[in-house]
Swiss-Prot record:
Lineage, uppermost ranks: Bacteria, Pseudomonadati, Thermodesulfobacteriota, Syntrophia, Syntrophales
NCBIfam families: nusB
Biological function: Involved in transcription antitermination. Required for transcription of ribosomal RNA (rRNA) genes. Binds specifically to the boxA antiterminator sequence of the ribosomal RNA (rrn) operons.
Source organism of the structure: Syntrophus aciditrophicus (strain SB)
GO-annotated cellular components: cytosol
Family stated for the protein in its record: Belongs to the NusB family.
Keywords: RNA-binding, Transcription, Transcription antitermination, Transcription regulation
One Pfam family named in its UniProt record: NusB
Record carries keyword Transcription: yes
Protein name: Transcription antitermination protein NusB
Chain's gene name: nusB
Gene3D superfamilies tied to this protein: NusB-like (1.10.940.10)
Length: 161
């Protein structure tokens, strides 16, 4: 296997670890009232985490928590039969993290974000979490792209000579 492939595998592994850490911290923020930064510092103080995973974990945690009202509104708009309050804390945490990635992390392909979230749901959620998360993220992704497709592109200004 080439060096490039190994680096890519390492990068993907670090991203997965970062998402798992973010899930744990976001879940804890659902249970214990504190600031995201404080929760992150507590995690680093009590659990081992690769240094390479920390910046991305922190980005996901702080971003998802800071924008949670906006994110929850987006999730709620794609889950007709489930209010955000009825969702499990694990599913809600995974969805918040994934929606943050979809909306704010343009360098991450949406399908990667969605697949990672579905995998986390299968591992850490209930037996139906993977398909539940998939359904909501698919609907949200379709809404985002439909909205982008409907935006008119302004014609270039006419040149004056």
């Amino acid at each position: 296997m080439s060096r490039v492939c190994h680096k890519l595998e390492d990068f993907m592994r670090q991203r997965r670890i970062a998402r798992e850490i973010a899930l744990q911290v976001l879940y804890s923020l659902e249970v214990v009232e504190m600031e995201a930064g404080e929760a992150i510092e507590l995690y680093w103080a009590h659990y081992e985490a690769p240094m390479d995973a920390r910046p991305f974990s922190s980005l996901l945690i702080e971003g998802a928590w800071k924008h949670r009202d906006q994110i929850d509104s987006l999730i709620g708009g794609c889950s007709a039969n489930w209010s955000i309050a009825r969702m499990s804390k694990v599913d809600k945490s995974i969805l918040r993290m994934a929606v943050f990635e979809l909306c704010f992390c343009e360098d991450i392909p949406p399908k990667v974000t969605m697949n990672e979230a579905i995998d986390l749901g299968k591992v850490y959620g209930s037996e139906n979490s993977g398909s539940f998360i998939n359904g909501i993220l698919d609907a949200l992704y379709a809404k985002i792209h439909k909205k982008n497709d409907e935006q008119e592109i302004a014609p270039p200004p006419e040149r004056s000579e």
